[in-house]
């Protein structure tokens, strides 16, 4: 069994769990993000995800880091970790974005990737005066967008007359250090999201879900016809970890976090969600601490329990775990010291 890769969500909107945790700031800051990434490298994490929002979706009065300038700065401030920047195609013309990505690819010496997100938080789009396309059309837009971006990354001289974009005789240099181009991650729970991932993505991002749901999802996505591609589609999963010496201690901490998170005002977030987004339709089915599934993945328990569950996900086809913690620093260090070695032992035996 292959060893999994571990990553962290950069807390670009403050924190990843309860908004009012006494040990963590509510507002985001670049200096904190930089410290966490550098510590993550030292702890053995090999990738990181920087979500993209113009305004803080949890509370629009709180600070929100800008994704792409943060990605460029973190690329310079780090040595080994993969930098994944989320991108909502509605916010950037593909030519401009392709050029920006190539520059961060150069800064990072080939450690840069993108996470394609077709947008779900309406206020940041509509307040900017941008047309918030219907759900399925956003994926059509994203498909044309990413195909144009990838052609430019490959160094092609591009002539495109599409539904959304017209580009004439354009080639970008210098080309990509990452070959054939920076990796494309893509997540979503709708049929259009799955179809686009099968056609254009290198890695499909899964929201944290119970193991049986993840197994079924991977089986279904693997059945979707894939465009000609040098590699099969890989799978990554988000999760929020609560690990302690015993299952009882972990459950006690989880209940404390759940109680804190229960006091969060989510009305602003939910009012801004596109009602057609499947992920949010599933929230009631999979209640959790953390975003994008969080603790619904079941990584709550003793160090041995969490390690066994990670090994089960690896066996199901997940090779990358994008993790959230709270408090972030201490829990990330705990995971590195206690859980990573146990997973390694289990996967080596398997």
Question: Language-model segments: which ranges?
Answer:
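N-terminal beta1-alpha1-beta2 module of alpha/beta enzyme domains
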Residues: 1-77, 161, 179-182, 281
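An alpha-helical appendage that flanks or caps ligand/catalytic pockets
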Residues: 2-4, 8-12, 42, 128, ...
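Hydrophobic faces of well-ordered beta-strands that scaffold small-molecule active sites
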Residues: 4-8, 48-50, 82-85, 112-116, ...
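Active-site mouth loops of central-metabolism enzymes
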Residues: 16-31, 86-95, 178-189, 241-244, ...
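Conserved, mostly hydrophobic/aromatic
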Residues: 40, 44, 74, 104, ...
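Alpha-helix-loop-beta-strand connector modules within alpha/beta enzyme cores
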Residues: 61-84, 141-145, 333-350
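Glycine-enriched alpha-helix->loop->beta-strand junction motifs that scaffold or abut catalytic
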Residues: 77-80, 108, 199-205, 317
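Active-site-proximal alpha-helical scaffold in enzymes
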Residues: 95-109, 113
């Amino acid at each position: 069994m292959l060893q999994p890769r571990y990553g962290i969500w950069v807390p670009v909107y403050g924190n990843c769990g309860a908004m009012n945790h006494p040990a963590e700031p509510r507002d985001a800051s670049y200096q904190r993000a930089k410290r966490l990434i550098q510590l993550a490298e030292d702890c053995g994490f090999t990738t990181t995800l920087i979500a993209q929002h113009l305004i803080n979706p949890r509370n629009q009065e709180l600070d929100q880091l800008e994704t792409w300038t943060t990605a460029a700065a973190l690329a310079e401030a780090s040595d080994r970790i993969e930098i994944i920047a989320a991108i909502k195609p509605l916010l950037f013309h593909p030519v401009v974005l392709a050029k920006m990505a190539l520059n961060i690819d150069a800064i990072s010496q080939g450690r840069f990737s993108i996470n394609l997100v077709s947008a779900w938080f309406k206020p940041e789009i509509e307040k900017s005066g941008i047309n918030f396309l219907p759900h399925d059309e956003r994926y059509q837009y994203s498909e044309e967008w990413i195909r144009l971006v990838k052609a430019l990354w490959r160094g092609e001289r591009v002539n495109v007359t599409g539904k959304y974009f017209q580009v004439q005789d354009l080639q970008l240099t210098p080309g990509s250090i990452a070959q054939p181009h920076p990796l494309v991650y893509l997540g979503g729970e709708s049929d259009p999201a799955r179809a686009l991932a099968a056609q254009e993505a290198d890695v499909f991002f899964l929201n944290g879900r119970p193991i049986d749901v993840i197994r079924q999802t991977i089986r279904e996505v693997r059945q979707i016809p894939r465009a000609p591609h040098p590699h099969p589609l890989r799978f990554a999963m988000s999760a929020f970890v609560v690990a302690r010496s015993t299952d009882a201690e972990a459950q006690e901490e989880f209940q404390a976090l759940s109680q804190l998170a229960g006091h969060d005002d989510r009305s602003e977030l939910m009012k801004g969600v596109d009602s057609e987004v499947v992920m949010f339709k599933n929230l009631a089915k999979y209640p959790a601490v953390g975003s994008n599934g969080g603790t619904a993945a079941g990584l709550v328990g003793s160090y041995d329990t969490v390690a066994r569950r990670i090994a089960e996900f690896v066996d199901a086809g997940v090779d990358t775990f994008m993790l959230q913690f709270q408090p972030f620093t201490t829990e990330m260090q705990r995971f590195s010291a206690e859980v990573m070695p146990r997973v390694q032992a289990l996967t080596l035996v398997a």
